[in-house]
Amino acid sequence: VFDILKAKESFMNYVRQFDLTNDKIHLKLVHTLEVVRTTEYLCLYENITGVERDLAYLIALLHDIGRFEQIKRFNSFDDRNIDHAKLGVQVLFKEGMIRNFIDDDQYDEIIEKAIAYHSLYKIPNNLEPSLLKQVLLIRDSDKLDNFRVKNIESIQTLFSISDADFYSQRVSQNILKDIENHTLILKENRHNEVDMWVSYMAFVFDLNFKSSYLFIRENDYIHRNMERLHFIGDLKEDMLFVEKTCQSYVEEKCM
């Protein structure tokens, strides 16, 4: 049913129509391929094999396909412009592009819903078990690769602001409270770019597989992501609190 190599080829053909010299487009291309790799890691450790594994790979390949059109239109990752998950579903299923990636339509509903739900703050209750597993896999893989992205990309590429503007901010009190309470941060509750940065670290509070925590620990992502930025004064104090809280949460989950 699945020809992952053909699907990858179709994906690359689709992406070539966009401006690959645009940092944001390039970021999302690499991110997609890395999410496939992270999915391989999770499937290996969670003993997910056969059709279930191939389906997870395909969903990983397609999960952010709406991002390319979003960046082309707005040159931004901000979902207040347009919801990239809904846009992905539209491109694949309303415009029929899904058949470029898989001939058989029996998995369409799972693929469509996994893409639609991958970036929601909270997924719907009572999902059918095979769908739930795919949704949890893509949500974890996506979040895990975000730690890699935050480890290498510039402030300018990530947030479209200067380093000086970024470092002049403080973490909002409600955001620090969410960290203290081990809570995933709602987009609407973020007030500035350092809040956004902290919200990415808070992804650790919404992972579903033990292997996801092992992956973060193996790569030392919490510490490395905090260490690479040059926080000073009060902002540094805020960030040390965030780092310590997230780090100890990961350690606990690895036990």
Label the model's feature ranges.
Residues F68-I110, Y121-I123:
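Hydrophobic/aromatic-rich structural module bridging two neighboring secondary-structure elements via a short loop
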Residues V1-K86, E128:
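Acidic/His-rich, divalent-metal-binding segments that scaffold phosphate/diphosphate chemistry
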Residues N47-L58, I98-A116, S130-L137:
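Acidic/histidine metal-binding catalytic segments
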Residues D3, I25-K28, D79-H84, D103-Y107, ...:
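A generic short-segment signal for beta-strand/edge and adjacent turn/coil regions
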Residues F77-N81, K113, E153, F159-S160:
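Alpha-helix boundary/interfacial micro-motifs
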Residues D23-L29, L33, R37, Y41-E52, ...:
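Divalent metal-dependent phosphate-bond-processing catalytic cores, especially two-metal-ion Mg2+/Mn2+ enzymes
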